[in-house]
Amino acid sequence: MTNFGRLRVHIAPVGFQFRRVTEPLVKMLADKVYLVTYRENDDARKFVDQVRKELQKYPHVEEQTIYLNLWDLYECLEKFRQIVFNEKQNHVFVNVSTGTKITSIAGMLSCMLWKATPYYAPVAYPKTNEAQPPPTEIVEDPEVLPVYDINKPKRESLQVLDILNKAGGRMRKAQLISELERAGVIRLKDESIVKFTKAAKHSQLRVILDPMELEWNYVKVESNGRRSEVSLTEQGITALRIFGTP
């Protein structure tokens, strides 16, 4: 635990080098770890068991196992986001040196998006003339990696995506305005104005939708006479999966 009462929580995908999971937990004084693996009984099971056996030496480290598709970027991002949000009162670290390449990518993206700390555990291999891996890897001190901010969609943009998704991916503008009014996104901002006109509501909606359509390609706006509809694009669906509901 840190001086400020925050737990040191680790997300650690389990690969075939179990010490790259356990050594950083010990050296970085972990309080809790989420072990990420594919299935309960797959080829990596024995390595998960090795990690658990090693952690028995450190009973203060709480362990929780998470099962997910390690080759699905979006599933990994969704789960990592959920963990970071659930542990937002703590300091979350992500091991990007273990698991699959996809979990490493998801780990780095998660850290940049949701302010966790990534680290890499290098392995020192002894010099040998034989082309075979050593029986036991020597894990050096983990290296904390730099992270940079990623521009995330605004909250109201995510609300629009969520509303459209729940409506089946398409909605008339008038219906969307009603939903956004209900959510408090479209509202009368000047109390000196007595009447909140239809034109004013459409103007506020346009401010939200224009960048979503023209810059991000999250939605498509189609007009047919006086009837206008807003539909969710594949890019918008992907954004909702990555960034989550507001």
Where are these regions (language model features)?
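Long, low-complexity, Lys/Arg-enriched
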Residues: 1-91, 105-246
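Short N-terminal targeting/anchoring amphipathic segment
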Residues: 90-98
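Polyanion-engaging groove/track-forming segments
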Residues: 101
